[in-house]
Regions:
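Bacterial N-terminal signal peptides
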Residues: 9-16
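A structural signal for short, hydrophobic/glycine-enriched beta-strand patches
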Residues: 43, 48, 53-65, 70, ...
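Signal peptide processing junction and immediate N-terminal pro/mature segment
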Residues: 19-41
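Serine/threonine-rich, low-complexity intrinsically disordered segments
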Residues: 16, 38, 77-78
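Bacterial N-terminal signal peptides that target proteins for export
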Residues: 1-7
């Protein structure tokens, strides 16, 4: 009997591995041109009752073996099996007690919060010297009379970044850092871009991303260099003004850090201070979502019978207000109307409203929050049916951030989702140029495929690559 069970387990493992390898080699993300479908009144040729064991990530494998051993299958927040994804563990819970820092610099937060890792870092002579140098520089910074002086004292130059990389390369082979990679770096999905690299390579790549991210904040919000989208993301002050120099002096003098700071903490704290004085905390607003705006919807996920719906969720792409007094624009309202109609037609059990504090710059209104209010007030859609994604600032990140919610909350990502927006927006989002834009701005395509099915809607599948945190975009990393 034991031999039969062992043979069965080996057969299951081998079969799943072969199936996954074959599918992985034959399936690639694509942007498809609009088809001939003109309405949403039909099932859209999307089979919704497929057995999940036939999907590309062989999701039933782990639980079938678990049940043979007399153990219950693991589940996600949505009540679905906790399927394994390459480079991501759906049971991993992100720790975001300081969300602006944590989402921009998750690696550095892990360094700070792990006492064993922190001690090992603080014992390296090269890193000790760097910490002392930057701490002394930060203490001198209030004496600066222009923004370039601050920058020269605090910025991490190329040789310094490489010197730290060398130290981390050496530390990566220690069991404490291997454990950090096993328990945090890899299962978090935050560094999924480097999933195929060794632990040491992932650690070094993540450090270089963090260093470039800190320097990027210094460039944009310290020196006033133009961000990619300058109309909405730029610095909030006239950097040549006496008022700004006074603010910098005062706030820099207030920066606190440990008596024996880690090598990155002086630069990190200065960068975070720049975001603070420019009122650029968008990345952390409403976090943790699952305990606030998304609490009701997340708690309801286990009640959803996913096979009763042709789509897993409906994504609504936000549209900013016309001025600082407009809570939701006519375009935004129209897009939300379409989503409500699809929801009431039972196309999906959830609506994800996506959009942050975007247009105009420093608007007091969050697109996603206003769309949620609109859905609840006009259509009486229950809060449990609406997930809020309140940070996206562009179409690229609308898709990326919605994918993150789906993977983090355990929404079945092997199923197709629906996106709705205005006609021209859907048209542009389903062209090949949209893939090019994503790769240029994000470094990857956050969608496995997208296909236009009507003038105002397209179906798509989210990509697990979306979990990667991007420190180059501090307002929505």
């Amino acid at each position: 009997m034991m031999l039969r069970k062992l043979v069965l387990a080996v057969v299951l493992l081998t079969s799943a591995f072969v199936q996954n390898a074959a599918l992985s080699s034959s399936v690639s993300p694509s942007v498809r041109e609009p088809g001939t479908d003109s309405a949403l009144a039909h099932p859209l040729a999307q089979e919704t009752s497929r057995e999940m064991c036939t999907e590309r990530r062989h999701p039933c494998l782990r639980d079938s073996l678990a049940m043979q051993a007399g153990m219950p299958p693991s589940t996600t927040q949505a009540g679905m099996p906790a399927f394994p994804h390459p480079g991501f563990d759906s049971n991993y819970k992100l720790s975001l007690p300081s969300p602006v820092q944590d989402k921009n610099f998750y690696l550095l937060s892990l360094f700070q919060r792990n006492p064993v890792v922190r001690r090992l870092l603080s014992q390296r002579r090269t890193l000790q010297q760097l910490a002392a140098t930057k701490a002394a520089a930060l203490k001198r910074a209030p004496g600066c009379n222009d923004v370039r002086c601050f920058d020269q004292l605090i910025r991490l130059d190329g040789p310094t970044i490489e010197a730290v990389a060398t130290e981390l390369q050496a530390l990566a082979n220690r069991p404490e850092f291997k454990l950090l990679a096993k328990r945090e770096l890899r299962p978090s999905g935050v560094f999924i871009t480097y999933n195929n690299q060794s632990d040491a390579q992932m650690l070094v790549a993540a450090w270089k991303d963090a260093a470039k991210g800190m320097n990027r904040i210094l460039s944009v919000y310290g020196l006033g260099e133009a961000p990619r989208y300058k109309d909405i993301d730029r610095v909030s002050y006239d950097l040549s003004s006496e008022a700004y120099r006074i603010i910098l002096k005062v706030k820099t003098a207030e920066i606190k850090f440990a008596k024996a700071p880690l090598f990155f903490e002086p630069t990190l704290n200065f960068a975070l201070m720049l975001l603070e004085i420019n009122r650029r905390d968008e990345a952390g607003r409403f976090e943790p979502l699952e305990q606030g705006e998304n609490k009701a919807a997340v708690q309801n996920l286990t009640e959803i019978k996913w096979n009763d719906y042709p789509y897993s969720f409906i994504l609504v792409l936000g549209s900013g207000g016309l001025d600082l007094t407009t809570s939701i624009s006519p375009i935004g309202a129209k897009r939300t109307d379409v989503a409500a109609q699809l929801f009431l037609q039972h196309k999906a059990p959830l609506i994800i409203v996506s959009g942050g504090y975007v247009h105009p710059m420093q608007t007091p209104y969050c697109e996603a929050i206003e769309m949620k209010k609109y859905l609840m007030a006009k259509y009486k859609i229950p809060e449990a049916g609406i997930l809020v994604e309140p940070q996206a600032r562009h179409t690229t990140t609308n898709f990326r951030n919605a994918a993150r919610l789906a993977f983090r909350y355990g929404i079945p990502t092997e199923r197709t989702a629906l996106v709705t927006s205005s006609e021209d927006h859907i048209a542009s989002s389903t062209r090949d140029e949209f893939r090019t834009r994503n790769i240029s701005e994000l470094g990857y395509f956050p969608i496995e495929y997208i296909k236009r099915i009507s003038l105002v809607a397209a179906e798509f599948k989210p990509s697990v690559a979306s979990l990667f945190f991007d420190a180059n975009d501090p307002l929505d990393p």
